[in-house]
């Protein structure tokens, strides 16, 4: 992983389900997996995968068959390239949920996973500041209780790619969605996140303020950030959080 950087989010549902971008008040979350497949002298090749999670009970819009992500230069926020990713087998799958604490009623809580991959690798030239990837959509799940306006808040799924000239460097793989990815009321939960790093680097996790979407998608399902990291606006917490 080295200095690969991701933004993570933990948000609480009314039924104390923890989630991991348009779907109309349906998005639960997502992540990027970036794999360097070839490190060249002036550029490198990457395979980019996006995983999306949606509320399959309350969500109105289905998983899109394709998404277009943007890749931008850090420091300039200039678009380097866009990339179309395709939904595997053109269909999502339902995430199995449940443990000894709580087994959700699938008629009430049901999460769909969509996995998106490109048809070809993405080539990025050496650039000293590196790049960031963004996919955005709206809106979040209306049952989220710790955000002030979740059904109008979008999401930016985000990752940073260091300068390709630094050598072999891939992102972590978050593995399967945890079956017990929720907290029960007045209870604690401890689980091992099934994350691995192909480069053997150490992994550190942090809870961060969730990223909203940018000011309108101008590059497919993406838009350039502004200013310094984290480049995109954050969501406003509800009172008390």
Question: Model-found features: residue ranges?
Answer:
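Long, compositionally biased, intrinsically disordered segments
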Residues: 22-241
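Bacterial Sec-dependent N-terminal signal peptides
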Residues: 1-28
């Amino acid at each position: 992983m080295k200095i690969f950087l991701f933004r993570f989010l933990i948000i609480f549902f009314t039924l104390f389900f923890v989630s991991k971008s348009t779907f109309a008040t349906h998005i639960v979350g997502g992540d990027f997996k970036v794999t360097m497949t070839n490190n060249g002298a002036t550029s490198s090749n990457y395979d980019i995968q996006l995983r999306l999670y949606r509320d399959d009970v309350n969500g109105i819009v289905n998983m899109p068959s394709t998404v277009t992500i943007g890749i931008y230069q850090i420091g300039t926020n200039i678009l380097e390239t866009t990339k179309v990713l395709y939904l595997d087998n053109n269909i999502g799958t339902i995430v199995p949920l449940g443990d000894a604490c709580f087994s959700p009623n699938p008629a009430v809580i049901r999460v769909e996973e969509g996995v998106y991959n490109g048809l070809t690798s993405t080539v990025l030239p050496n650039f000293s500041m590196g790049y960031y990837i963004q996919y955005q959509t709206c809106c979040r799940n209306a049952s989220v209780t710790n955000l002030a306006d979740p059904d109008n808040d979008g999401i930016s799924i985000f990752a940073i790619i260091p300068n390709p000239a630094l050598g072999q460097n891939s992102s972590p793989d978050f593995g399967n969605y945890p079956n017990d990815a929720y907290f029960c009321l007045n209870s604690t939960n401890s689980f091992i996140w099934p994350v691995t790093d192909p480069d053997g680097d150490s992994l550190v996790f942090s809870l961060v303020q969730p990223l909203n979407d940018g000011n309108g998608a101008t590059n497919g399902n993406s838009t350039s950030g502004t200013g310094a990291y984290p480049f995109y606006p954050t969501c406003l917490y509800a009172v008390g959080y």
